[in-house]
Design a protein with these regions (language model features):
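Short, internal strand/loop/helix patches
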Residues: 27, 43-96
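Short amphipathic alpha-helical segments and helix-helix/interface helices
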Residues: 9-17, 89, 133
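Solvent-exposed loop/turn segments at secondary-structure junctions
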Residues: 1, 31-36, 65-69, 107-108, ...
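Helix-adjacent hinge/juxtasegments
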Residues: 2-3, 15-60
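Structural recognition of the beta-strand scaffold that forms the well-ordered cores
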Residues: 24-30, 59-63, 98-103, 108-111
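Conserved redox-active cysteine motifs that mediate thiol-disulfide chemistry
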Residues: 1-11
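Short aromatic-enriched loop/helix-cap "lid" or pocket-rim segments at secondary-structure transitions
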Residues: 38-41, 74, 113-114
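Thiol-/selenol-based redox modules, centered on thioredoxin-like
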Residues: 86, 94-140
Length: 140
């Protein structure tokens, strides 16, 4: 299920690029609590060993840490090191499958949980997909 949502976001990113929209960026941040889980088949970087993948995803993927490096200066009150939560997830107050949309200045435009708002264009008559796409386009 998670791979499907990440795959849909990858497809949306490629769709935007094909439409000539190249001033938006996507990335995934794996939660600290999931750092010991295999995510290869979720991000589809190993097609030979992942039966759920048609193509390699192009969206960059990174790992959240709990080392406090992001809890300095203006973020001091937002997170703390070694609390068993990732620093970035603490700062943004996210949960599993949250999609964060930022504007050009890095300000929050929207936070949507993809567990409850399936982005698949074949679900909800494409309404969630279109809403997410429009939020991204309007944040540019």
């Amino acid at each position: 299920m998670c791979r499907a949502r990440f795959g849909v976001l990858n497809d949306l990113y490629l769709e935007l690029l094909n439409e000539g929209i190249d001033d938006v960026k996507f990335m995934g941040i794996n939660g600290f609590n999931y750092s010991n889980h295999s995510f290869n088949c979720m991000i589809c970087d190993d097609l030979e060993n992942c039966s759920n993948c048609d193509n390699i995803n192009t969206i960059p993927w990174t790992q959240d840490l709990d080392d406090g490096q992001n809890c300095l200066d203006q973020n001091q009150e937002l997170c703390e090191p070694n609390d068993e939560n990732g620093d970035v997830w603490d700062i943004w107050n996210v949960i599993l499958r949250d999609l964060i949309i930022l504007d050009r200045e890095g300000k929050l435009v929207a936070k949507i949980n993809l567990t409850y708002n399936n982005p698949d264009p074949t679900s909800t008559c494409g309404e969630n997909y279109d809403t997410i796409k429009n939020l991204i386009l309007n944040a540019r």
